[in-house]
């Protein structure tokens, strides 16, 4: 599925992605310059940093967009495997805590035509892959956006991959109920690479 087909069904989401992530892959009208802008780099290897085994710690806001400040915590593992030479990857997560266990699968697919990633997530509770998060990386930071419904109201969803090193990275999920003006983080995960022989 191309990004444009997805966004045709959701023009509001397209506008948000363009506004919040300038690398969204659609040219904007700009004043004429003496030289043409450099083409966007191929992002096929944006997730290469994540291949392998990880330990993870997750903080999850129990009731997002309700004013709640009650968080629950989980610890566990994540494994990410390369598919199609890096044009796709599969991530598995298995974490547990006082609030229970979360088992999830992340499928990430790269579209070379738009130079964007499509991230789909399913948990073992219902197996639904859901609508994709769409975006890419710029200067070591990944931003991905989606539009969903939460408790009967339309919201925007944002993933941010940050603090990427050879041994660690962070992932934050946030929701916005006001069209992207403000964001409330509700899933904060830190990852540490499992060292060989450890």
Question: Where do the PLM segments sit?
Answer:
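N-terminal secretory signal peptides that target proteins for export/translocation
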Residues: 1-7
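Bacterial N-terminal signal peptides
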Residues: 10-21
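Hydrophobic small-molecule pocket/channel-lining residues, especially in calycin-type beta-barrels
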Residues: 28-198
């Amino acid at each position: 599925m191309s990004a444009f087909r997805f966004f045709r069904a959701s023009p509001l989401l397209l506008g948000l992605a363009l506004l919040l992530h300038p690398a969204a892959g659609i040219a904007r009208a700009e004043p004429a310059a003496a030289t043409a802008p450099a083409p966007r780099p191929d992002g096929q290897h944006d997730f290469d940093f994540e291949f392998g085994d990880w330990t993870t710690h997750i903080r999850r806001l129990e009731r997002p967009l309700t004013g709640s400040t009650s968080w629950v915590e989980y610890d566990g593992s994540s494994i990410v495997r390369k598919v199609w030479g890096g044009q796709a990857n599969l991530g598995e997560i298995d974490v547990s805590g006082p609030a229970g266990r979360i088992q999830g699968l992340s499928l990430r697919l790269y579209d070379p035509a738009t130079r964007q990633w499509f991230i789909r997530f399913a948990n073992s509770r219902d197996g639904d892959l859901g609508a994709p998060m769409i975006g890419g990386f710029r200067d070591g930071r990944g931003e991905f956006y989606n539009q969903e419904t939460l408790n009967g109201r339309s919201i925007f969803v944002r993933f941010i991959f940050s603090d990427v090193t050879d041994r660690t990275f962070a992932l934050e999920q946030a929701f916005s109920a006001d069209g992207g003006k403000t964001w409330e983080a509700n899933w904060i995960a830190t990852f540490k690479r499992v060292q060989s022989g450890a």
